[in-house]
Amino acid sequence: MSAMTPREIVHELDQHIIGQAKAKKAVAIALRNRWRRMQLSDDLRNEVTPKNILMIGPTGVGKTEIARRLAKLANAPFIKVEATKFTEIGYVGKEVETIIRDLVDVAIKMTREQQTKKFKHRAEEAAEERILDALLPPAKDQYGESQRDDSSSTRQTFRKKLREGQLDDKEIEIDLAQAQPNVEIMAPPGMEDMTNQLQSMFQNMGGDKRTKRKLKIKEAFKLLSEEEAAKLVNPEELKEQAIFAVEQNGIVFIDEIDKICKRGDSSGPDVSREGVQRDLLPLIEGCTVSTKHGMVKTDHMLFIASGAFQMAKPSDMIPELQGRLPIRVELEALTADDFKRILTEPHASLTEQQRELLKTEQVTIEFSDDAIERIAKAAWQVNEKTENIGARRLHTVMEKLMEEISYDASEQAGTSLVVDAAYVEKHLGALVEDEDLSRYIL
């Protein structure tokens, strides 16, 4: 769990997302409150439930990007799902409970990586011994048992060479556990438990099969280290820690929630809309979900929902769901000035990406300030005239602008180019002004 302060979280998000201070502040406080809750006494901790967030804003203003960056910062089990992927229980399609099952799988993977890292040193030592045994097979005693002599000068010489990388390209034959086949079983909704039991039955049928493989020492060391680390990880402890992490620190980001809202002017039942909202209610309110790793409570998970709400309004959600998303954050539409900042300020901005990509062809490219201004203005104008797709329009405009340079770059190694306002005007001017062209090309 991340112990970053709200100010630090916002600063980190500022490296990648321009503007949207309110949304950043809301998610930063929510993330910090997860840490604060973990510092409380057990009886009080159970009483403190997270305040779920609803982010409202047009497409392309940073809602999904905030979620992606938050996942990296949180250091907690995190899953992002699209609300439109789910259908009401009893119909063909994914049920909302699969969100929690997938989140537990994420937590298992995260916890396994942490445990493997913890045992890395011991695993590498064991792998080293197995490689030395392959290089210098130990003598056997009268009962046929291997008698390893760790103090022998030959073994120590080989150990030194192995650690210095002098033997990396030498081939050896090693005994490795055979990978279990991954059996996927399709089953109707509601029968996940039976599916999981069948899957584990098929996987256990293979038993502990081993196979001999001839590999270079460098590759063998990596595979043996992984195998030894897996032996040191306790599966029961792993499940326990993963489920605790999900229950106490899990974060679920539900995107496109506006697409499952029933608009006021429509009538009749809708399998993928109101029913899905009703299925989400117990999950957000707090319930127990059965997974293949055990029972998981959702009472203290943080849910962040987001939507553009262009065709529907937040008030079109069923009242119970509105009440379970108490924190509302509105994200502002992006201006031409925001576009200008997006092109230059974030870490790995679009202009920096283009510079680095062309550098691989020994072509140096620079963007003048007036060119940046013109690109930003062009993207903003197209958004105003056609559909407003926010910052995503910049990708389209940049690709169109760089098309010619990218095509010829491999034949222009060693050259330097400056993209100025005149170049932008020449390649984008007509497209921006002609509404029909910009509708189809930009």
UniProtKB/Swiss-Prot annotation:
<dbReference type="GO" id="GO:0036402">
    <property type="term" value="F:proteasome-activating activity"/>
</dbReference>
<keyword id="KW-0963">Cytoplasm</keyword>
<dbReference type="GO" id="GO:0051603">
    <property type="term" value="P:proteolysis involved in protein catabolic process"/>
</dbReference>
<feature type="binding site">
    <location>
        <position position="18"/>
    </location>
    <ligand>
        <name>ATP</name>
    </ligand>
</feature>
<dbReference type="InterPro" id="IPR003959">
    <property type="entry name" value="ATPase_AAA_core"/>
</dbReference>
<dbReference type="InterPro" id="IPR050052">
    <property type="entry name" value="ATP-dep_Clp_protease_ClpX"/>
</dbReference>
<dbReference type="InterPro" id="IPR027417">
    <property type="entry name" value="P-loop_NTPase"/>
</dbReference>
<dbReference type="GO" id="GO:0043335">
    <property type="term" value="P:protein unfolding"/>
</dbReference>
<feature type="binding site">
    <location>
        <begin position="60"/>
        <end position="65"/>
    </location>
    <ligand>
        <name>ATP</name>
    </ligand>
</feature>
<feature type="binding site">
    <location>
        <position position="392"/>
    </location>
    <ligand>
        <name>ATP</name>
    </ligand>
</feature>
<dbReference type="GO" id="GO:0005524">
    <property type="term" value="F:ATP binding"/>
</dbReference>
<dbReference type="InterPro" id="IPR003593">
    <property type="entry name" value="AAA+_ATPase"/>
</dbReference>
<dbReference type="GO" id="GO:0008233">
    <property type="term" value="F:peptidase activity"/>
</dbReference>
<dbReference type="InterPro" id="IPR019489">
    <property type="entry name" value="Clp_ATPase_C"/>
</dbReference>
<dbReference type="Pfam" id="PF00004">
    <property type="entry name" value="AAA"/>
</dbReference>
<feature type="binding site">
    <location>
        <position position="255"/>
    </location>
    <ligand>
        <name>ATP</name>
    </ligand>
</feature>
<dbReference type="InterPro" id="IPR004491">
    <property type="entry name" value="HslU"/>
</dbReference>
<comment type="similarity">
    <text>Belongs to the ClpX chaperone family. HslU subfamily.</text>
</comment>
<keyword id="KW-0547">Nucleotide-binding</keyword>
<dbReference type="GO" id="GO:0009376">
    <property type="term" value="C:HslUV protease complex"/>
</dbReference>
<feature type="compositionally biased region" description="Basic and acidic residues">
    <location>
        <begin position="142"/>
        <end position="152"/>
    </location>
</feature>
<protein>
    <recommendedName>
        <fullName>ATP-dependent protease ATPase subunit HslU</fullName>
    </recommendedName>
</protein>
<dbReference type="Pfam" id="PF10431">
    <property type="entry name" value="ClpB_D2-small"/>
</dbReference>
<keyword id="KW-0143">Chaperone</keyword>
<dbReference type="GO" id="GO:0016887">
    <property type="term" value="F:ATP hydrolysis activity"/>
</dbReference>
<feature type="region of interest" description="Disordered">
    <location>
        <begin position="134"/>
        <end position="162"/>
    </location>
</feature>
<dbReference type="Pfam" id="PF07724">
    <property type="entry name" value="AAA_2"/>
</dbReference>
<comment type="function">
    <text>ATPase subunit of a proteasome-like degradation complex; this subunit has chaperone activity. The binding of ATP and its subsequent hydrolysis by HslU are essential for unfolding of protein substrates subsequently hydrolyzed by HslV. HslU recognizes the N-terminal part of its protein substrates and unfolds these before they are guided to HslV for hydrolysis.</text>
</comment>
<comment type="subunit">
    <text>A double ring-shaped homohexamer of HslV is capped on each side by a ring-shaped HslU homohexamer. The assembly of the HslU/HslV complex is dependent on binding of ATP.</text>
</comment>
<feature type="binding site">
    <location>
        <position position="320"/>
    </location>
    <ligand>
        <name>ATP</name>
    </ligand>
</feature>
<keyword id="KW-0067">ATP-binding</keyword>
